[in-house]
């Protein structure tokens, strides 16, 4: 039986009708070897048995059907490449040399923060039973007004912001990736800010003074994500680039709550559109965004998977059509890993 995806998940199908490009990627480096058989058992127990979406087959129109006979040998592999097949559920784990786990999940199934929730579920020492919950908190009038204000502000930024030119809608496949691993404490932001500022100010990227940098903000805690079945629960809050102002400090000091919620509701609105209109609007929004800056704190302490210590975690987000760059910081065990992807 077919079901329609939630609007916030369907948006990512509109942005990638091929269901092959918008893949969130993650790598776990283990201190001790594990076997692919044990990894399959763990994925079955912790993920497939708890989250229905890991059995979903998603169509390019944004509908889901359940894979009745999920073949784990196709989704948890050993020494192969991550290849997302639209005819199967859109995820894969690949064990390389028994000590590195590569993970690929399509954005329609889960966003980056949900991927963190998946990692936390896989590394639980005593897995608990997941009970579906819904928040009963009623929004205040001030929150409603800030949200309405944020919707109009986000719409103005996306549709009418002056001096911001749309980039080429064609998605370039020729991009280079560079990774840094910095042993910085979580309280030290210097290197992250320096790299971010240098990247945004790089004249080769042709980022204008009025360009928009999109900062993903989670609107749901990890616990709520797990209890409510994962999925996309974040907003892209637009942040203008201004000279001689720290992008990071500006974002942290500005009152962004209404704008964040406004951007979230716009994404839900686009996800509710008919397919042809939703695809058009998603391309327009993504083409307006020149880059994505995100940061995820996974754990301050070391986690274990199947008894093996996780030494390092890397993660990166896909580049949407029209974007110039993407940079992701992963905070794990007191260190920061920066992954940067730039279009050539």
Which residue stretches match the model-derived regions?
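Extended, hydrophobic beta-loop-alpha segments that form or line the acyl/peptidyl-thioester binding
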Residues: 322-344
